[in-house]
Amino acid sequence: MGSFSLLHWLVVLVIVLLVFGTKRLANGAKDIGSAIKEFKKSLREDDKPTDQLGSTSQSTASGPQQDHGKH
């Protein structure tokens, strides 16, 4: 009695489809999918600038030290 059977889930699915309609549910699922894609893309983009910042900060830190020795 505590767990739901397959029949219970099918009844819930039919009720949700009747209330919201298939078009609205499809649009909602599509929006969630695109939001997840954008989130993963932003995570990948955040990793790239960190690596680039580390390499440029090392090269700029060594650049002025060499210039001061020549003057």
From Swiss-Prot:
Its main location: membrane. Keywords: Cell inner membrane, Cell membrane, Membrane, Protein transport, Translocation, Transmembrane, Transmembrane helix, Transport. The keyword Cell cycle does not apply. Residues 52-65 have a biased composition (Polar residues). Residues 43-71 are annotated as: Disordered. The chain crosses the membrane at residues 1-21. GO terms for molecular function: protein transmembrane transporter activity. GO terms for cellular component: TAT protein transport complex. It is a single-pass membrane protein. GO terms for biological process: protein transport by the Tat complex. It is found in: Cell inner membrane. Pfam families: TatA_B_E (PF02416). Part of the twin-arginine translocation (Tat) system that transports large folded proteins containing a characteristic twin-arginine motif in their signal peptide across membranes. TatA could form the protein-conducting channel of the Tat system. PANTHER family: SEC-INDEPENDENT PROTEIN TRANSLOCASE PROTEIN TATA (PTHR42982:SF1). The Tat system comprises two distinct complexes: a TatABC complex, containing multiple copies of TatA, TatB and TatC subunits, and a separate TatA complex, containing only TatA subunits. Substrates initially bind to the TatABC complex, which probably triggers association of the separate TatA complex to form the active translocon. NCBIfam families: PRK04561.1, tatAE. Belongs to the TatA/E family. This is Sec-independent protein translocase protein TatA. It comes from Xylella fastidiosa (strain 9a5c).
